[in-house]
């Protein structure tokens, strides 16, 4: 059975939650779950590497970008998959085009979106809290009449997408 590494970075905890949900669905497999800065994050000893991160202000969270840059040559020899969390899941394809090189995207067995969250209380800085509150209010208030915009919903973590991704991993790890 192949060894799987799930490596991620999180700022507000949403990516950690999603990574843990994925990990929990892989019982019976040899899986390591860790952050990008952990010693176990070295992908050399693994067959399959899953990299997760969030989109913040249109960019991949910096620790994940740094991890991809540092380990690019090693990752090129592995089966890799990616998951993102973002406030606007409908834009995930656009985000992947911006955050991965063409080669990274082509090599991936999956480019998934695990949804996202906009929870101002989880934000660390006052600026982030303010931006999240404005974005949530924009979605919920959406117009002059105060009704929720019909074309937008508050994002949540997608357990369905996580389950699909876990299914792919189970097949690959045989």
Predicted regions and their residues:
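Structural motif
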Residues: 47-48, 79
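Structured loop/turn residues at beta-strand edges in well-structured enzyme cores
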Residues: 2, 44, 106
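A short, aliphatic-rich alpha-helical micro-motif
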Residues: 43-44, 75
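FMN-binding flavodoxin-like domain, especially the glycine-rich phosphate-binding loop
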Residues: 25, 29, 57-174
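A short, well-structured beta->alpha microelement
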Residues: 29-41
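N-terminal beta1-alpha1 ligand-phosphate binding loop
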Residues: 2-27
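Structural beta-sheet core signal
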Residues: 5-6, 33, 51, 81-84, ...
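Acidic/glycine-enriched edge-of-secondary-structure segments
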Residues: 18-30, 48-58
């Amino acid at each position: 059975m192949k060894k799987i590494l799930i490596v991620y970075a999180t700022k507000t905890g949403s990516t950690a939650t999603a990574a843990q949900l994925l990990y929990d669905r892989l019982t019976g497999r040899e899986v390591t779950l860790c952050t990008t800065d952990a010693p176990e994050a070295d992908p050399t000893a693994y067959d399959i590497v899953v990299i997760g991160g969030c989109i913040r202000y249109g960019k991949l969270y910096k620790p994940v970008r740094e991890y991809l840059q540092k380990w690019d040559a090693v990752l090129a020899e592995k089966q890799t998959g990616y998951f993102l969390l973002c406030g606007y899941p409908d834009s995930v394809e656009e985000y992947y085009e911006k955050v991965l090189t063409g080669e990274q995207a082509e090599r991936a067995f999956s480019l998934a979106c695990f949804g996202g969250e906009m929870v101002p209380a989880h934000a660390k800085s006052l600026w982030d809290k303010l931006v999240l509150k404005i974005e949530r209010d924009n979605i919920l208030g959406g117009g002059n009449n105060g009704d929720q915009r019909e074309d937008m919903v508050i994002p949540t973590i997608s357990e369905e997408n996580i389950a699909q991704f876990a299914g792919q991993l189970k097949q690959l790890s045989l």
